[in-house]
Regions:
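A short, proline-enriched helix->beta-strand linker immediately N-terminal to the Walker B motif
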Residues: 62-66
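Short coil-to-helix segment of the ABC ATPase nucleotide-binding domain corresponding to the Q-loop/switch region
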Residues: 1-10
Length: 150
């Protein structure tokens, strides 16, 4: 079992993307960015679900990705923890990070997204700007979905 710091620095150091010192410096900066710098020496078992999810985001950011993929990042969280994860993701979007997010968090998609896709049965049913997607859905299937969730 590794500490949070060791979890974050493991991949960049093993892949020789950074020295151990650079990786630790970067990890502390990223932990501060998500409000968890005090957890650097903690173990994952001591974290809440929202904290674990924010640490997972930091682990990804430590690799300096150009794009981040999120698959229902809040689905397993206690409702009280959802906001802290969405806030980190919103900040990432505002900083210019390209993200592909699978979510049922419609408010988040509307507020943060630049393009929203609706899928049904593995097919893209509709794709549009958030404004058009939510105020003027074209497909009957999307209209039905939005009427149930909004």
């Amino acid at each position: 079992n590794l500490t949070i710091m060791n979890n974050i620095t493991l991949a960049p150091v093993k892949l020789k993307l950074m020295s151990e010192e650079e990786a630790k410096e970067n990890a502390l900066k990223l932990l501060k960015r998500v409000g968890l710098e005090e957890k650097a020496d903690a173990y994952p078992a001591s974290l809440s679900g929202g904290q674990k999810q924010r640490i997972a985001i930091v682990r990804s950011l430590a690799m300096n990705p150009r794009v981040m993929l999120f698959d229902e990042p809040t689905s397993a969280l206690d409702p009280e923890m959802v906001g802290e994860v969405l806030e980190v993701m919103k900040e990432l979007a505002e900083s210019g990070m390209t993200m592909v997010v699978v979510t049922h968090e419609m408010g988040f998609a509307r507020e943060v997204g630049t393009k929203v896709l609706f899928m049904d049965g593995g097919n893209i049913v509709e794709e549009n700007t958030p404004q058009e997607f939510f105020t003027n859905p074209k497909s009957p299937r999307l209209q039905e979905f939005l009427s149930k969730v909004l």
